[in-house]
């Protein structure tokens, strides 16, 4: 299911990502959810999460336990 806000994200995402990265995650997840409407429910969910993590990783890098904004 698409997320209405960052407050709706799973705790595993909310507690690890900074707020801006959470916004990226929500936007990418929701966009992918629409894009992959033809997939079955479980595969659609997995695909949307993969896209969301990829979007976050384009703007942030994980250093230790923290996600740091990329300088580029």
Question: What is the meaning of each model-derived region?
Answer:
Residues 1-72:
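C-terminal alpha-helical interaction appendages
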């Amino acid at each position: 299911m698409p997320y209405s806000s960052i407050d709706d994200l799973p705790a595993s995402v909310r507690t690890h990502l900074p707020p801006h990265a959470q916004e990226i995650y929500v936007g990418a997840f929701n966009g992918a959810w629409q894009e992959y409407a033809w997939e079955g429910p479980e595969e659609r969910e997995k695909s949307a999460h993969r896209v969301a993590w990829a979007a976050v990783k384009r703007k942030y890098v994980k250093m230790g336990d923290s996600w740091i904004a990329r300088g580029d």
